[in-house]
Amino acid sequence: MKTLSVIPLSDSSRWDQTVHSFCDYDVYYLSGYVKAFQLHGDGDPILFYYEGEDLRGINVVMKRDIAKDPRFIGKLPENQYFDFATPYGYGGWLLEGPGDRKPLFTAYERWCQDNGVVSEFVRFHPVTANQEAIYDVYDVIGLGGTIALDLSSPETVWANLSSKNRNMIRKAQKNVIHIYNGRFPAIYEQFQEIY
């Protein structure tokens, strides 16, 4: 059976249980994360969950009333036209399984049309590369690279640094540069004096 369901933020336990059932989920999909942005005024969080034959998917969005945008106040009726945006960070559909994606996106498009959603802006996750599975559904535009560093071991980190950065680190070590991590009042006082 193929179903597209909407999980509201008010059902946060079901929301998080659904998200945790996916291998590549990230904090950006969890209810507590999106609730903070709802409180900030970024829209109403919705989690879409699709389950079909050999395919499952989730998508978290912030639903915003376009009539409340300063450019449209007084020009559009409220609660009629909406847009979706990824919560701050990354999002987009996370898909698992080799099944046919067409029924998912047909159901999703129908839901959006039936509920007045006229656009969606997605910041896809650069590590999970979830946009790869849906180039034929979304207009995906690259906006620059993301820098990532494999932190699996100190040796791997060192090997992946550029020679210029390794030389700068050696120079700092030679000059006995100290790096502190923590909240020590004495460090803050020294910083203020230097600054």
Regions found by a protein language model. Name each.
Residues 18-28, 194-195:
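Helix-loop element at the rim of GNAT/NAT acetyltransferase active sites that forms part
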Residues 49, 57-60, 118-124, 180-182:
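A structural signal for short, well-ordered beta-strand segments and their strand-loop junctions
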Residues 99-143:
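Non-catalytic accessory segments adjacent to catalytic cores
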